[in-house]
Amino acid sequence: MAKENAEFKEYEKLLDQAYEQLPDKIFEAKRFKVPKGYSVIQGNRTIIKNFGDVSRTLNRDPQHVLKYLLRELGTSGNVEGNRAILQGKFTHYVINDRVKEYVDNFVMCHECNRPDTVIIREDRIDMLKCSACGARAPLKSL
């Protein structure tokens, strides 16, 4: 009996050491990927061809996404159907970087890092409310 108890304690010790060596998020697969904007430059304008699809994937109002992009890029523009037209020449790298920043600031939950969020307005303050964990965080105004 004493031998079995000693073996069990040794087994638990080895098991604890193995768990300490594992990373925190070992097999977590992300189900959300930041959508890429497909853009073309025509003259002095940049057209994001799939802007409506991008905003739908993010579950956000296209006007809100556009307002953020315009502010970050320092330009003017508008939405026409599924496209966004921006004044100026911007590469798809610049646009996709700004979309990634938008996702980090206005889509992903700051507590659980899930994209299951909605923007609500409480007492004249925009809040990011997570549907997964219930967390609420104030947002920067646009």
UniProtKB/Swiss-Prot annotation:
Presence of keyword Protein biosynthesis: yes
Supply the SUPFAM superfamilies for this chain. Translation initiation factor 2 beta, aIF2beta, N-terminal domain, Zinc-binding domain of translation initiation factor 2 beta
InterPro entries, sorted: IF2/IF5, TIF2_bsu_arc, Transl_init_fac_IF2/IF5_dom, Transl_init_fac_IF2/IF5_N, Transl_init_fac_IF2/IF5_Zn-bd
Database matches in SMART domains: eIF2B_5
GO MF assignments = translation initiation factor activity
Q: Which UniProt keywords apply?
A: Initiation factor, Protein biosynthesis
KW Protein biosynthesis (keyword) present: yes
Q: Which domain of life is it from?
A: Archaea
Task: State the family named in the UniProt similarity comment for this chain.
Answer: Belongs to the eIF-2-beta/eIF-5 family.
**Subunit details for this protein?**
Heterotrimer composed of an alpha, a beta and a gamma chain.
The task this protein performs is described as: eIF-2 functions in the early steps of protein synthesis by forming a ternary complex with GTP and initiator tRNA.
HAMAP family in the cross-refs: eIF_2_beta
Name listed for the protein in its UniProt record: Translation initiation factor 2 subunit beta
Biological classification of the source: Archaea, Methanobacteriati, Methanobacteriota, Methanomada group, Methanobacteria
Q: Which gene encodes it?
A: eif2b
